[in-house]
Amino acid sequence: MTSFRLANLTVFLVLLFCFMRGVHSADDLSKIPEIKGYELHCIEASGITESSAKKLRNGDDIASPDQSIKCYVQCFFSKLRLMNEKGVVQKDKVLSLLGKLMEEDKAKKLAEKCDLRRTNPCDTAYAMYDCYRQNKAKLL
């Protein structure tokens, strides 16, 4: 993976974890060997287009996300064990990760606010992701 793509993946991971100030945490995540394969695996598994994956990596707003976009996010959440194989959010793991990226009280508030349930795992994952993305400025 080129350094540019790895940098984009790191940016995406930071976005995925609410753009919090723990830059060193994103660097640490990018060094985990499994992370490097997640993007390619999740692109293939979800059927997302390269342009949509790029929008997610860049933190762009996606007005009408299709199922492939939602399932791409769900794939990452599943790989990071933030959701189990049935799409159930693993609250303890979400809190643990958020706690590494921000103050504990902010982590709890964000986890509560973004503990959203939808009709299927892909919709749930995307709703959570979008909540984190929308609330990042309020938590910095």
Curated annotation (Swiss-Prot):
InterPro entries: PBP/GOBP, PBP_GOBP_sf. One of its GO terms (molecular function) is odorant binding. High-level expression in female mouth parts, particularly in the proboscis (at protein level). Low-level expression in female antenna (at protein level). Female salivary gland. Female chemosensory organs: antenna, palp and proboscis. Male antenna, wing and maxillary palp. Expressed at higher levels in male tissues compared to female tissues. Not detected in midgut. One of its GO terms (biological process) is sensory perception of smell. Coiled coil: none annotated. It comes from the Eukaryota. It is found in: Secreted. Keywords: Behavior, Secreted, Signal. Gene3D superfamilies: Pheromone/general odorant binding protein domain. This is Odorant-binding protein 10. Pfam families: PBP_GOBP (PF01395). Residues 1-25 form the signal peptide. GO terms for cellular component: extracellular space. Belongs to the PBP/GOBP family. Disruption phenotype: (Microbial infection) RNAi-mediated knockdown results in increased probing initiation time. Involved in modulation of blood-feeding behavior and capacity in female mosquitoes. Required for normal oviposition. Required for normal fecundity and fertility of female mosquitoes. Required for normal expression of VGA1 gene, which encodes the egg yolk protein vitellogenin-A1. Required for normal female longevity when mosquitoes are maintained on regular sugar meal. It comes from Aedes aegypti (Yellowfever mosquito). The keyword Secreted applies. Induction: (Microbial infection) Up-regulated in salivary glands following dengue virus type 2 infection. Up-regulated in chemosensory organs: antennae, palps and proboscis, following dengue virus type 2 infection.
